[in-house]
Amino acid sequence: MTDIKKFTSFATSNCYLISPFDNEIVFLIDLPPNIDEVIDYINTNNLTIGGAFITHGHWDHAIGLSSFDSKAYINLDDEHLARNPSDQIGDFLGDKVSVNKYEGNLHNVLDHEYDFLNVYINPGHTKGSVSFEFKDLGAVFTGDFIFKDSIGRTDLYSGDNNEMIDSINNVFTLFQDDFQLFPGHGDDDTVINIKNNNPFIREYLKW
C-alpha cells in the first residue's frame, strides 16, 4: 500500500491509514463514523493494525472507537469527549441521538512507545487536541487544529481562542516547512503553503 491513504466520512472528517514501516503493519489517525469501511479495506488487503491515534475527542473523529478492537491512544484531557459521543452528536444531527458510551481502554498518547511518532499538544479546538508528526513520512496530522485554508472552531466545549492563538505560535511554527500537513477535514498541503496562504495563520502568527 502507499504510505498514507485517506478515508472521508459523511461528517467530512478524515481517517488516515499510515504505513510507517516496510511491512503490513498500519496505524490509523482518527476513528470517524466510516471506520467499518477502513477496517474492511485493512482486512481485504491482509494488513495488521498496530493501533490508532486520535487527534481529539469530538464524535466525528472518535465515534469509531465503538467498532475498534485494537489499541487506541488519545490525550486524556479529551477522554470524556471520546467516551461520550451522545453529548455531541445530537446537536450535529438535529435530534437527540443515543450512542453507547465507549467502555474500552484508552491509552495516554503522551506515553506512547513509538520511535517514529512525535506528539504535539495544541489546545484551542479542544483542551486535549494534539497533532502527530511522522518524520520518516514527512507528514504531520493536525486533526481540527489547522486546515488548509482555516483553523478549528474554538466555540465548542473546552475550546479556547486564546489557547488556539498560542498553539499556532508555539506549535504550528515547529512543523517543518516541507512537510505535508494532513488535516481532520478537507485537503492536505505543505506546511509552507499553509503558512503563506491560510488567512487565519497569517492573522494570528506573530512573525
Question: Where does each model-flagged region fall?
Answer:
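Active-site HxH/HxHxD metal-binding segment of metal-dependent hydrolases
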Residues: 33-112, 199-203
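Short, glycine/acidic-enriched loop or turn micro-motifs at the edges of active sites
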Residues: 22, 33, 59, 78, ...
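Active-site neighborhood of phospho(di)ester-bond hydrolases with catalytic His/Asp-centered motifs
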Residues: 28-30, 50-58, 72-75, 121-124, ...
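Conserved beta-strand hairpin/beta-sheet module of binuclear metal-dependent hydrolase folds
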Residues: 1-45, 131-143
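Conserved N-terminal boundary motif of the eukaryotic protein kinase catalytic domain
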Residues: 116-118
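Metallo-beta-lactamase
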Residues: 121, 126-207
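Hydrophobic residues at beta-strand termini and immediately following loops
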Residues: 7, 109, 122
